[in-house]
């Protein structure tokens, strides 16, 4: 997959920045009002009862703040957070090592939880339900099962593919929160806050322009601001103005709706080769040279969100809105 400026996936250079920008409390957290308000109630109720918070599943497109919310949950509960990911847990023993190291009340955050192997999920079930761990000792006829008690803990799982979770695992989460794309106003506030951290002056109109092209995603908004800041320092006087912002984003090939060359390639491929569709996912994959799951999980969600693409039983269809965006005539049926 191409390295994309507009990818919601975390890149190496994002890690330190996101840590420094990360809000510590729900009050500081911008956006996701529905999920935030529900979590406020659930956390306060758990603290009043002096219990651990129910297990939480956070799902939605990448870059919307799932990792940030997991850390905030731990902060609000006044406990530590232990972070791992589905791909990092290769064997049941790996999960057992993580679980037995937890302290009472701790938050265990598993990113990409949909990538856990089914055999590891089965170890997780009793840990989530009964706070215990069943371990098989020995092999063959002499093998025996030993049950270890675990301290009460909260599992926070994050996924971009909630549908890929097995039903037994999904059903063990007491709190399910879908994170939605951010509004332009919310992203503009995030851009201005990030500019303060960077100690960079930014015009409010420039912040809005970056927000409009950030695909509803804070991670992308912050990444665009970093690149525009570079242009402001080299081609301007250091202030991020509307003029500098528009010039920078044009040179970076980010159009007014936040579409880049890969989005154009996908949409125009369907329009020019298949008369706008319907066309199957595998055919689209072969046409643009990207894996089907990458198209489905990374490229399509935003195009669906803005109404440029439709998924139908017969395949993908490019909508009239996309034709208008490209200044193309809609083909007659």
From Swiss-Prot:
Residues the entry annotates as binding Mg(2+): 67
Question: So where does DNA get bound?
Answer: 311, 316
Highest taxon, organism lineage: Bacteria
Q: InterPro entries under this entry? A: AAA+_ATPase (IPR003593), AAA_lid_4 (IPR041445), DNA_helicase_Holl-junc_RuvB (IPR004605), P-loop_NTPase (IPR027417), RuvB-like_N (IPR008824), RuvB_C (IPR008823), WH-like_DNA-bd_sf (IPR036388), WH_DNA-bd_sf (IPR036390)
Subcellular location per UniProt equals:
Cytoplasm
Lineage runs: Bacteria, Bacillati, Bacillota, Bacilli, Bacillales
Q: Name one GO biological process term.
A: DNA repair
Question: Native species of this protein?
Answer: Bacillus cereus (strain B4264)
Region (Small ATPAse domain (RuvB-S)) location = 183-253
Instruction: Name the chain's protein.
Output: Holliday junction branch migration complex subunit RuvB
Region feature (Head domain (RuvB-H)): 256-333
Q: What is its EC number?
A: 3.6.4.-
**Subunit structure of this entry?**
Homohexamer. Forms an RuvA(8)-RuvB(12)-Holliday junction (HJ) complex. HJ DNA is sandwiched between 2 RuvA tetramers; dsDNA enters through RuvA and exits via RuvB. An RuvB hexamer assembles on each DNA strand where it exits the tetramer. Each RuvB hexamer is contacted by two RuvA subunits (via domain III) on 2 adjacent RuvB subunits; this complex drives branch migration. In the full resolvosome a probable DNA-RuvA(4)-RuvB(12)-RuvC(2) complex forms which resolves the HJ.
> Coiled-coil segments, which residues?
none
């Amino acid at each position: 997959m191409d390295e994309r400026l507009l990818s919601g996936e975390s890149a190496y250079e994002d890690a330190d920045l996101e840590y420094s920008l990360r809000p510590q409390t729900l009050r500081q957290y911008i956006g996701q009002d529905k999920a935030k308000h529900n979590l406020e109630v659930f956390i306060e109720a758990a603290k009043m009862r002096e219990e651990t918070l129910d297990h939480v599943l956070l799902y939605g497109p990448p870059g919307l703040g799932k990792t940030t919310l997991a850390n905030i949950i731990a902060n609000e509960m006044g406990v530590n957070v232990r972070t791992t990911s589905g791909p990092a847990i290769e064997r049941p023993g790996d999960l057992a090592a993580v679980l037995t190291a937890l302290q009472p009340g701790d938050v265990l955050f598993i990113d990409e939880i949909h990538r856990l192997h089914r055999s590891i999920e089965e170890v997780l079930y009793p840990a989530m339900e009964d706070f215990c761990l069943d371990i098989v000792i020995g092999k063959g006829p002499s093998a025996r099962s030993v049950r270890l008690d675990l301290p009460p803990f909260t599992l926070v799982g994050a996924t971009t593919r909630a549908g890929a979770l097995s039903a037994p695992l999904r059903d063990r989460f007491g709190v399910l929160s879908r994170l939605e794309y951010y509004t332009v106003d919310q992203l503009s506030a995030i851009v201005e806050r990030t500019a303060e951290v960077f100690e960079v002056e930014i015009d409010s109109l420039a912040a809005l322009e970056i927000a409009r092209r950030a695909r509803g995603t804070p991670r992308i908004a912050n990444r665009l601001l970093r690149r525009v800041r570079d242009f402001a320092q080299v081609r301007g006087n250091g202030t991020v103005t509307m003029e500098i912002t528009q010039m920078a984003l044009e040179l970076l090939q980010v159009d007014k709706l936040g579409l880049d060359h890969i989005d154009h390639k996908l949409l125009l491929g369907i329009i020019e080769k298949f008369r706008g569709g319907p066309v199957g996912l595998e055919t689209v994959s072969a046409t643009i040279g990207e894996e089907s799951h990458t198209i489905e999980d990374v490229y399509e969600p935003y195009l669906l969100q803005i109404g440029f693409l439709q998924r139908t039983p017969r395949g993908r269809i490019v909508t009239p809105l996309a034709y208008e965006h490209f200044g193309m005539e809609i083909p007659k049926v």
